[in-house]
Amino acid sequence: ITRLKATEAMLIDAKEKAEESDRLKSAFLANMSHEIRTPLNAIIGFSSLLPHIEDAEERNHYISLINHNNELLLNIINDVLDLSKIEAGHIELSPVWCNLSDLIDESCTECQPNVPEGVTLKKRYPATPNLIKQDPMRIKQVLSNLISNALKNTVQGYVEISYETTPSETRISVSDTGRGIPEDKLGIIFERFEKADTFIQGAGLGLPICRSIMEHINGTIEVTSTVNKGSTFTVVFPCQVRPME
């Protein structure tokens, strides 16, 4: 009888996990359908207007909107492909000596057009920066996703990127003065099919990508947050460290 009960409990648990997986996949597909359809509709709609617009300024405005939605659509597709590739273990790491300050500078420059009015993008570096040996492309991917996530959730104040190194690891933090994350949502924000706020633009894949990359390089990602005050995301990963020459 005991064995039967144990088997029954295992079957019930497996059934519940399968149902939860199906629910998450359905939610993801519904969300992806919405996220992809939104920029597609804009591209199609504005493109259909262009042949009928003679005013150059108005025409350029619509072209700008089309380009913006092209980039949005491409980012969504890239996120889906990147996450699938990383989770399947189909990425190769290429560690090289790199300057983390430079990687942060590049990420901030790329994110600058998305900084809301009233928000300052700040950087805080060690007094004596070091070189780290890690895959710069993956570290930059994590940086870009964390910065973009912070900017989406901050309408006033700042987003600050800082880091510190020890002889064997690096710690990067991205802090913001945004809306914060409710405590009951902290456990789901790194799941690939979930978003803490469904009204925030994006497919909700940036943080899962960060988590997957960190797992791939034996690192960790954590978050602390207070509603209406802001959040801090911190990644820690092992790497070789040496002084800059």
Regions found by a protein language model. Give the residues of each.
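Conserved catalytic submotifs in the C-terminal HATPase_c
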Residues: 94-99, 118-130
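Short alpha-helical segment of the dimerization/phosphotransfer core of two-component systems
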Residues: 68-73
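Short conserved segment of the HATPase_c
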Residues: 181-193
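Short alpha-helical Gxxx[C/S/T] motif in the catalytic ATP-binding
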Residues: 206, 210
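Primarily the dimerization/phosphotransfer
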Residues: 10-50
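Helix-loop junction within the histidine kinase core
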Residues: 84-95
